[in-house]
């Protein structure tokens, strides 16, 4: 199992004498340590797969981890006493995101939290609408600020009453009041938001010893990826799951902690040593990704930050190309220059477009690069585009599914009952909402209540009751009938395809219907697959050993629900997009540095390396110095950006940049100086931006004709 590991990686895999922290520098092979350790636990140390959980932050990372573990365990047998020689039941492993694990815990323990197992999971847009309703405003920036404040409170395990008691000013008091009402509204809807998927299990484990003990006994070894990105709530959940046994391995890198703005805290690394005094720390410092020049620049930058743990990356990949820093007159010149040099570099190296990434600090920087790439007919992929599940047509179908599972989900009812149109207008829904509010019931329940006739006519009530009858029939069948049959009947009953062709032009309708069919196909495949065990087996302990070659979950790392539609619906809410379905296109990658974390590219252009952009000012005024904590996080972000590059790294900055209606003078980022690059005169940026004709002439010269 340990073939090909270096000594530090091997120690990380084999150490089982207590809590373990693997400090894994960029490109040092941390995923290999996690996957090899899972295999070591099962094949060599007698652990059953159902007692192991590995958690990470993204569906993509979890999918990669599952795939690697499946390959490692192919053909392997158990070493568990009494089960020696049996094929490893890979499908019983839990390899998932934090939120997927949270959903499984909530499904099992819903009754302890006043929830039904088919609770709804609200997305960001649903939550935005709820906050907007509480604030009674259309001020979107204000709504987002309050929404983010509520999220930070939840992630810090601050209750609404505590937020109210600690409010320092009127704005905080208003936000705390909204928080209190927001939590009550969620409970009335029998719904949770994404933050609740971690917060509620943590609070439950803290309050209920029996539940906590049950989960500690079932998940007997934990592996935590990207530990530096955990927030207070996630750390609390992990600590409660680990319990006194403290059988866990946390893998992370304090130098790559770049999510402070969403509640992640480096304090968790410090706290780990306090809460677990016997913590064993292992450092992975050999980098398998980048050249010596790239690593030297990264080490020089991050050395300016105070250190929790001393470590320094090294590589045996050779010195590599010099790192270049190119000034540009303005944004347009910068984009022209980068795209031209990328094209020339690709030709010289006989590379592919997919070998190149253009990284930037903020999404606002992407537009000009998109324009130039399109003009030059260079294919590109923009990271962070519209999620498959954010498309309106997918949200429409999801609204029906949510309502089938949970009749108390008012936002789902409003969307489903009005799409397609059924002659139920806003006036009718407002009257229904007022009636339901006074009766303190859901909209769905209010449709059937006596007294509604005093508010609405039979002509208004009958379409709503017909719709709710339809949903109830589907819900009754969803518990027992195959998911495929229920989905087909639902789609036939709502006439969604006809609605699309009525509401949109033919091309749009075709695209939207194609997306719906793809989504339904995905659901049906999950609904008809053999049941995988995952966490459900870990909790119940009643599943057989299964077959390592089949049933391995490739979506969320947890239990599928076989042919039952209801269990699939919560899985849908967790998926940010259909991962791994599209082949990696031969295209330049445009991405923020945050979105590039965990990825690598042979050749990287890091653009906009200017004061105010990298490092970003945040909320600071231009005249005020950026505070030390922000600079340290921005420096870690620069470190992440540099270490995405495998073979070459080119930096650019603008001398001037447009801001609103004025042109501002820019200074090169302090991080360029901190890289301590070889002294060399930078390329001149005094010439006018190249015309397309000049570029064509240069390319012809480069091509020898």
Tell what function each PLM region has.
Residues 6-14:
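Pre-Walker A adenine-sensing motif
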Residues 215-232, 249:
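SF2 helicase catalytic motif II
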Residues 1, 535-556, 679-705:
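Acidic, low-complexity intrinsically disordered tails
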Residues 31-39, 65-66, 235:
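Motif I (Walker A/P-loop) of helicase-class P-loop NTPases
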Residues 22, 26-34, 49, 110, ...:
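Helicase P-loop NTPase motor core
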Residues 2, 7, 40-43, 71-72, ...:
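Conserved RecA-like helicase ATPase core segment
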Residues 17-20, 39-221, 245-246, 266, ...:
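A basic/glycine-biased coupling hinge at the interface between accessory DNA-binding modules
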Residues 168, 366-378, 391, 398-678:
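Conserved helicase C-terminal RecA-like lobe
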């Amino acid at each position: 199992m340990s073939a090909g590991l270096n000594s530090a990686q091997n120690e990380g895999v084999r150490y089982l004498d207590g809590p373990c922290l693997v400090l894994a520098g960029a490109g040092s092979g941390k995923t290999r340590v996690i996957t090899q350790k899972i295999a070591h636990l099962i094949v060599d140390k007698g652990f059953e797969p159902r007692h192991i959980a590995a958690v990470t932050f993204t569906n993509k990372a979890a999918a990669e981890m599952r795939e690697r573990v499946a390959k490692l365990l192919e053909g392997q047998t158990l070493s568990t006493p009494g089960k020696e020689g049996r094929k490893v039941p890979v499908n019983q492993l839990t390899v998932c995101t934090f939120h997927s694990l949270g959903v499984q815990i909530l499904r099992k323990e819903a009754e302890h939290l006043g929830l039904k197992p088919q609770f709804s999971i609200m997305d960001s847009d649903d939550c935005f609408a709820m906050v907007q309703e509480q604030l009674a405003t259309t001020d979107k920036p204000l709504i987002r600020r309050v929404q983010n404040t509520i999220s930070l409170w939840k992630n810090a395990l601050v209750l609404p009453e505590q937020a109210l008691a600690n409010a320092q000013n009127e704005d905080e008091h208003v936000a705390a009041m909204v928080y209190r009402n927001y939590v009550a509204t969620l409970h009335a809807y029998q719904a949770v938001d994404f933050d609740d998927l971690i917060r509620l299990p943590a609070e439950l484990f803290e309050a209920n010893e029996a539940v906590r003990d049950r989960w500690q006994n079932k998940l007997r070894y934990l592996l935590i990826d990207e530990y530096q990105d955990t927030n207070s709530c996630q750390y609390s959940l992990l600590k409660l799951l680990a319990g006194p046994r403290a059988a866990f391995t946390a893998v992370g890198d304090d130098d790559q902690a770049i999510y402070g703005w969403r509640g992640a805290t480096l304090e968790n690394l410090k706290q780990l040593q306090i809460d677990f005094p016997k913590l064993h720390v292992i450092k992975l410092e050999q980098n398998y990704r980048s050249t010596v020049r790239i690593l030297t620049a990264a080490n020089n930058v991050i050395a300016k930050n105070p250190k929790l743990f001393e470590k320094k990356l090294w590589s045996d990949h050779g010195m590599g190309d010099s790192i270049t820093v190119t000034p540009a007159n303005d944004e347009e010149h910068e984009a022209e220059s980068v795209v031209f040099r990328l094209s020339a570099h690709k030709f010289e190296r006989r590379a592919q477009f997919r070998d190149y990434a253009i990284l930037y600090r903020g999404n606002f920087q992407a537009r000009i690069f998109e324009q130039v790439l399109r003009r030059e007919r260079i294919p590109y992929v923009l990271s962070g585009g519209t999620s498959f599940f954010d498309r309106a047509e997918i949200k429409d179908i999801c609204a029906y599914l949510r309502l089938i599972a949970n009749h108390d989900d008012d936002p789902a009812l409003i969307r489903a009952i009005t799409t397609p149109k059924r002659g139920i207008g806003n006036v009718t829904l407002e009257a229904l909402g007022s009636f339901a509010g006074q009766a303190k019931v859901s909209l769905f329940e209010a449709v059937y209540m006596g007294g509604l006739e005093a508010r609405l006519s039979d002509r208004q009530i009958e379409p709503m009751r017909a719709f709710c009858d339809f949903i109830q029939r589907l819900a009754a069948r969803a518990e027992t009938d195959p998911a495929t049959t229920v989905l087909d009947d639902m789609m036939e009953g709502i006439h969604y395809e006809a609605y699309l062709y009525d509401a949109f032009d033919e091309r749009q309708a075709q695209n939207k219907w194609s997306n719906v069919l793809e989504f339904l196909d995905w659901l049906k495949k999950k609904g008809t697959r053999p049941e995988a065990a995952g966490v459900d087996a870990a909790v119940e302990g009643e599943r057989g050993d299964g077959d390592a070659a089949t049933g391995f979950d490739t979506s969320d790392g947890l239990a599928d629900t076989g042919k039952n539609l209801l269990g699939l619906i919560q899985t849908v809410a967790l998926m940010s997009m259909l991962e791994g379905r599209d082949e990696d296109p031969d295209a330049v990658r445009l991405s923020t540095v945050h979105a590039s974390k965990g990825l690598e590219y042979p050749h990287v252009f890091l653009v906009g390396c200017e004061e105010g952009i990298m490092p970003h000012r945040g909320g600071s005024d231009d005249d005020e110095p950026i505070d030390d904590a922000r600079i340290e996080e921005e420096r870690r972000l620069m470190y992440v950006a540099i270490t995405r590059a495998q073979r070459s790294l080119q930096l650019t900055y603008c001398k001037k940049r447009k801001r609103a209606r004025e042109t501002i003078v820019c200074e090169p980022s302090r991080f360029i100086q901190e890289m301590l690059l070889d002294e060399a005169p930078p390329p001149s940026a005094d010439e006018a931006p190249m015309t397309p004709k000049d570029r064509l002439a240069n390319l012809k010269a480069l091509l020898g004709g």
